[in-house]
Amino acid sequence: MATAVKQDSILFTFDVRPLKMTDKAFYDFCQSNKDFRFEMNRKGELIIIPPTSIETSNRNSEINYQLRGWTKKDKTGKCFESDGMFILPSGAKRAPDASWMLKERFYALSVEDREERFAPVCPDFVIELRSKSDNLRKLQNKMREYIENGARLGWL
């Protein structure tokens, strides 16, 4: 039985380790619950990501627009918005607000990893946008996690 671990502001974390949720099971769970956004930390705790305010959404949209424009101009990589989930080497499953990776790393992934499941890779560049309800320490730890798992640059 999964148990609630804690509530931090409006962020809920559930300990689902007893369920032994595989990467595929997590993918299927997310696909079956598309009205919600989830992440999973390296400890195997399920995190429910709440919707943001329209102001935060607008800032996130602008960041993704700028990153997309740079990506099209630079032509060395691929960019992703917050619906793109990555399985980090630590086992954490994260969906940064915006991210980018070199084309070579993108195309080194199998078609299945790019199209039919969450990609088992850490992006080269990640952006996490802090909203008023976000805990700064938790976001800093999340950014540290990206760097420890191979991100070369992170913006918070």
Explain the meaning of each model-derived region:
Residues 1-156:
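Gly/Pro/Ser/Thr-rich low-complexity, intrinsically disordered segments predominantly at protein N-termini
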